């Protein structure tokens, strides 16, 4: 399936890299590359991962180290929604994401 990465997931990966880079810039680069590689693996066989109905319809997740890769499975695309540290309140973060106001339409 085609792989898509949400803007929020891109921000998550950047924040993870920035955090790791404070102590180890080389590892930060290699770890963020590993996260992207994991996303590619998910896109190859998305249905083997755990369903997460409490997060939304067609949502699944995959652990990678201490991080949780949360993604949706669409007709022709696997969309990475968030990459979050496992200690975070995943349900609350998804509720906030769903409650975010839609941007206004362009004139």
For the regions a protein language model found, what residue spans apply to each?
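Short proline/glycine- and basic residue-enriched helix-capping loop/turn segments at helix->loop/beta transitions
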Residues: 41-44
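Enriched for short, Lys/Arg-rich terminal
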Residues: 67, 72-107
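Arg/Lys-rich, positively charged N-terminal/basic patches that mediate binding to nucleic acids
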Residues: 1-32
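Basic/aromatic recognition patch in beta-strand/loop cores that engages polyanionic ligands
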Residues: 37, 47-78
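Short, hydrophobic secondary-structure boundary micro-motifs
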Residues: 29-30, 50-52, 92
């Amino acid at each position: 399936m085609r792989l898509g990465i949400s803007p929020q997931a891109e921000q998550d990966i950047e924040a993870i890299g920035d955090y790791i880079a404070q102590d180890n810039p080389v590892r930060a680069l290699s770890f963020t590359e590993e996260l992207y590689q994991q996303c590619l693996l998910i896109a190859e066989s998305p249905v083997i991962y755990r369903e997460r109905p409490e997060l939304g319809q067609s949502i699944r997740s995959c652990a990678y180290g201490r991080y949780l890769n949360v993604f949706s499975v669409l007709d022709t695309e696997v969309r990475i929604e968030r990459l979050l540290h496992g200690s975070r309140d995943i349900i609350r973060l998804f509720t906030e994401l769903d409650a975010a106001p839609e941007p206004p339409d362009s004139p």
